[in-house]
Structures are given as structure tokens and as C-alpha cells.
């Protein structure tokens, strides 16, 4: 039953080359995966920050301190910015690792499968991470100033806007063109409530849209009613009389 849930979750994550036959990772006919799928699984795991409390432990003790456990991921002690994650070795799969690291706010995952020995897997994983950090960077695009959006039929003429914060965009270190384009109507009808979605901001990398951010109302615009219009007229009338 648990293995069925593993396969269902793998399908949800888009791990199209993975079939789990057991939950221990040992060799079994039909028990397969790919480096890409392991990276996808690792990325999902890393969304739970608590996992690093365990993957970064080097030595621990169990059974009242009588048994010592040493992390099989040697990169925990040697690689700058390492976060984990998991090693594995079987006769069919060889020496494997999913290694994750973070530098300057950018997290990378390197997956090595089928290495001949542990030394080779750590060397290959380190080289892959080094390549990633040397050639890629995380750039957070800057939102343009948001205009006020005109309102028709409202007690106010316009509403202020807010936008979701853009996420970092992975770009080559050599430079890339990142732009943000706002898509807003000319006006919106009242009533407008704070939080109402009124448009989008499209983040583009070299012309291709990579993020779509919601633009929402920051302030409200109640609709004009007979009573509100009368109240407004009387307020203006008496203000004029007082002047």
C-alpha cells in the first residue's frame, strides 16, 4: 500500500521514468528511476526545510550512545554550502548521490548515478555543483512602479494596486534579458475590494514568459448608490454654503 502511494506521488511530481517496487531502495526487477527524476524528488523534499536538520548531521549516536552513526555523504564536511541530501549504493545501481548546495541564495541539485565507487560519486557531484555555481546565477527582477487604475461608477476615481513579489530567475552568468510587462485594463467597474485580481505582470526571460504574477487591488472602491450619491451631493452643497 505504501509503495502504491510512492508511485502515485511520483506521478504527481512528473517523475515519468520512475517505478517503485519497494520502499527500501534495494535492487528489484522493475524498480527504476532516472537522474532527472531523482532531482525532481529532491527538489520536492527540499521544500520542507526541516529535512536539513537531518541531512547535515555528520555524526550521531543511538542506543544510549553505544552505537555511532556517521553520515555517508562526505560532502557534508567538505563542500561549501552543502545542504545534503542522500547517498545510495547497490550492486545494480552503483554508487549514487543526490547532492544539494546553496550559495548566494541559489540552490542547486546534482545527481550522480552508477559511479564505480564513492570517491567518483563525490567528485562528480562536486564538479556538477561547481559548474552550476560558476555559470549560473539567480536574478530577482525588479517590479516597475504600479499606476493607479481608474474606476467607473465608484465613490473614488481610482484604486491603488499591489503585485505578487517576483521569484528569482535562473540566468546564465554571462547575462540575460529579463523584463516585466504589466497587463491591466483601461479601467474597472465598481465595486472593487482589496485583494480583487485586476491584472497580471508577466516576467520574461529572453522573450519567453517564465512567471505570471497577480496584480490586485490595494484599496477599495465602493459602488455609487442613490443614497451614497445623495449623501455626497448634500455634503458638497453644505460645504459650498459654509464657504
Q: What residue ranges belong to the model's regions?
A:
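Short, charged, amphipathic alpha-helices and their helix-cap/turn boundaries
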Residues: 1-18
Amino acid at each position: 500500500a505504501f509503495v502504491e502511494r510512492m508511485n502515485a506521488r511520483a506521478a504527481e511530481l512528473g517523475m515519468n521514468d520512475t517505478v517503485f517496487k519497494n520502499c527500501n531502495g534495494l535492487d528489484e526487477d522493475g524498480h527504476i528511476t532516472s537522474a532527472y527524476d531523482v532531482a525532481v524528488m529532491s527538489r520536492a523534499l527540499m521544500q520542507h526545510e526541516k529535512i536539513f536538520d537531518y541531512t547535515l548531521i555528520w555524526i550521531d549516536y543511538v542506543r544510549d550512545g553505544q552505537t555511532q552513526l556517521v553520515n555517508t555523504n562526505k560532502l557534508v564536511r567538505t563542500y561549501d554550502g552543502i545542504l545534503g541530501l542522500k547517498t545510495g549504493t547497490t550492486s545494480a545501481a552503483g554508487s549514487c548521490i543526490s547532492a544539494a548546495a546553496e550559495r548566494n541564495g541559489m540552490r542547486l541539485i546534482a545527481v550522480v548515478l552508477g559511479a564505480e565507487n564513492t570517491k567518483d560519486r563525490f567528485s562528480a557531484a562536486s564538479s556538477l555543483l561547481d559548474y552550476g555555481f560558476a555559470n549560473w546565477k539567480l536574478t530577482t527582477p525588479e517590479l516597475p512602479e504600479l499606476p493607479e487604475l481608474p474606476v467607473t461608477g465608484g465613490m473614488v476615481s481610482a484604486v491603488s494596486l499591489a503585485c505578487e513579489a517576483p521569484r528569482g530567475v535562473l540566468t546564465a552568468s554571462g547575462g540575460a534579458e529579463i523584463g516585466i510587462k504589466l497587463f491591466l485594463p483601461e479601467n474597472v467597474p465598481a465595486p472593487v475590494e482589496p485583494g480583487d485580481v485586476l491584472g497580471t505582470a508577466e516576467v520574461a526571460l529572453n522573450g519567453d514568459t517564465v512567471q505570471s504574477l497577480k496584480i490586485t487591488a490595494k484599496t477599495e472602491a465602493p459602488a455609487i448608490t442613490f443614497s451614497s450619491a445623495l449623501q455626497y451631493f448634500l455634503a458638497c452643497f453644505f460645504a459650498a454654503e459654509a464657504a
